[in-house]
């Protein structure tokens, strides 16, 4: 599925703005999609609906379907064209109707979907567009939610007390996310109508090599001849070819590299009959060789942030202003990488990372697969088919981005209690990712802090990615013990002869809280936490990177472990740096992107 663009052959019409909105229930067909919503209120699109009306807690605590509606008029300029309705994402399950006719259904809240509406939406006519989205998470969704009778992530309970058990039985149904971020929902990313000619370019795949050879494949719906031209960054034609697939050689090729290098971008300009499409790409290689990760043949060190799509008022909604600000803060911090924890981000963010030279670890929404020794998720959770779907959709969407250098299959599953079942679940996904990616990028799985000696899955990934909280959740506040424990584990990973990196580590830090002795939750402790652990990373030549948790404070489910959200951000939620960020900024300024451990 190509990203919609406007050019001489295609028209793109935004449907973003203020829509009509109504909360539903758990009944999927509660409202008639062919009629105006009853008692509708205004809602902004794209954005989460949860925090847009503080006059009531109903939106914040909603459980079930929510309904959106607006009128759509197609311009007469679109006459004779194919017309497509596209959603960047709707969280988590979506049904879409046009004039009461069901035109699309999609499960998965972080990837795009679309419907051909040429036969239903005619130029000069107005139609009623209705969208219903279901925010419920359970054992069949990604991310995973807990079922009735179970706790939310970091929830608390005095199980067995009669009054507590009675209150639980009497309580209204609610989401119990098995993940540590707020379950925002709604139409989160842009909604557009776009047109193409009747015969059109359907898909483009670009596989560049550092010698300047570019393999390409163009999928079309008709028989018109295909012509491709490579344009340099100034728009000059440097190579061309005929045919729907083949190879082009770029003379004196410029490579794409992360900042402070040059993230040089080319454009593959494609014509097919009346249709035209431009696909940007960068020429770079990424591979694992021994215990090193090589980008363009040079040993790479990741200096990165884990992030969330999260901000006040619009929740997880697409925000181009915030994306630009965050990218500039990443540059300011002297970082070079982002992990899209814990789901694929908006497509426009990857475009920015391509342009600005920021490396991306691209992650599926597979978080929360595990519940301790009592539950075997690989036998009891019906997830495998949906997991394959979201993995395939992510790779298909992001395959041409030079910024994407690593696929993450998921976050912190249970790999300890049912090790063989875990391997049997995850290894086929690892193989599938390699099969689906035409550039064959490295593939990983981010593992949590459990008994790593029983984990037989992580060690089989291309890069070992470990989430560890020595000094915070384990050996809390004792950084001497934390460093000892970390080194005990790193000795184990050294024996696996793989590149290893810390994909998540951090300490909750209340902005403005200061202590003389670097006590937990203070800004001083955040500095000490990173200073001590980072020094241990630097001693290991096979340790290839660090992704701090988190870029900024973010919202979570209520619970006794969270006071107004997760405070592990190096920036506050409104993007003010804490002391720990100033420490990391200096550290990362002294670490080169290439050749740090040679």
Where are these regions (language model features)?
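Feature marks short, surface-exposed loop/turn motifs that line or immediately flank catalytic pockets
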Residues: 91, 135-137, 287, 308-309, ...
């Amino acid at each position: 599925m190509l990203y919609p663009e406007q050019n001489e052959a295609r028209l793109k019409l935004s449907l973003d703005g203020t829509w009509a909105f109504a909360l539903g229930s758990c009944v999927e067909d509660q409202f008639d999609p062919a009629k105006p919503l009853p008692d509708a209120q205004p809602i902004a699109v794209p954005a989460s609906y949860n925090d847009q009306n503080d006059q009531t807690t109903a939106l914040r605590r909603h459980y079930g379907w929510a309904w959106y509606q607006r009128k759509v008029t197609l311009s007469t300029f679109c006459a004779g064209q194919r017309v497509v309705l596209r959603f960047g994402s709707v969280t988590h399950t979506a049904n879409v109707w046009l004039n009461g006719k069901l035109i699309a259904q999609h499960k998965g809240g972080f990837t795009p979907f679309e419907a051909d509406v040429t036969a239903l939406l005619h130029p000069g006519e107005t139609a009623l567009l209705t969208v219903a989205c279901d925010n419920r998470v359970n054992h069949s969704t990604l991310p995973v939610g807990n079922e009735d009778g179970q706790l939310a992530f970091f929830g608390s309970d005095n199980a067995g007390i009669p009054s507590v058990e009675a209150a639980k039985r009497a309580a209204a149904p609610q989401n119990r996310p098995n993940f540590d971020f707020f379950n925002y929902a709604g139409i989160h990313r842009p909604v557009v109508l776009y047109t193409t000619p009747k015969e059109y370019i359907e898909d483009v795949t670009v596989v560049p090599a550092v010698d300047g050879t570019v393999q390409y494949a163009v999928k079309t719906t008709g028989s018109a001849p295909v012509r491709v031209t490579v344009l340099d960054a100034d728009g000059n034609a440097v190579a061309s070819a005929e045919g729907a697939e083949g190879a082009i050689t770029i003379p004196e090729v410029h490579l794409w590299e992360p900042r402070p290098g040059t993230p040089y971008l080319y454009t593959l300009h494609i014509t097919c009959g009346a249709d035209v499409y431009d696909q940007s790409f960068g020429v770079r290689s990424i591979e694992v060789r021994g215990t090193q990760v090589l980008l363009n043949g040079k040993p790479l060190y990741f200096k990165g942030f884990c992030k969330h799509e999260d901000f006040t008022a619009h929740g997880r909604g697409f925000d181009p202003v915030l994306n630009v600000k965050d990218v500039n803060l990443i540059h300011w911090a002297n970082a070079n990488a982002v992990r899209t924890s814990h789901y694929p981000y908006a497509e426009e963010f990857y475009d920015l990372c391509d342009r600005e030279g920021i490396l991306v670890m691209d992650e599926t929404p597979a978080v929360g697969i595990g519940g301790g020794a009592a539950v075997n998720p690989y036998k009891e959770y019906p997830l495998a088919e949906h997991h394959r779907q979201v993995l395939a959709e992510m790779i298909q969407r992001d395959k041409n981005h030079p910024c994407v250098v690593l696929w993450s299959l998921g976050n912190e599953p249970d790999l300890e209690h049912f090790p063989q079942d875990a391997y049997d679940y995850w290894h086929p996904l690892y193989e599938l990712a390699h099969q689906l990616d035409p550039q064959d990028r490295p593939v990983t799985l981010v593992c949590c802090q459990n008994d790593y000696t029983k984990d037989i899955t992580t060690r089989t990934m291309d890069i070992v990615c470990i989430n560890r909280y020595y000094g915070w959740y384990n050996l809390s506040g004792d950084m001497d013990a934390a460093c000892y424990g970390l080194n005990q584990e790193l000795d184990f990973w050294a024996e696996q002869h793989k590149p290893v990196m810390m994909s998540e580590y951090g300490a909750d830090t209340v902005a403005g809280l200061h202590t003389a002795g670097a006590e937990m939750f203070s800004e001083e402790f955040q500095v000490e936490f990173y200073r001590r652990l980072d020094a241990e990373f630097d001693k290991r030549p096979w340790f290839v990177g660090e992704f701090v948790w988190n870029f900024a404070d973010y919202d979570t489910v209520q619970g006794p472990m969270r006071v107004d959200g997760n405070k592990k951000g190096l920036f506050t939620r409104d993007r003010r740096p804490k002391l720990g960020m100033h420490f990391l900024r200096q550290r990362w300024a002294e670490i080169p992107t290439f050749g740090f451990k040679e």
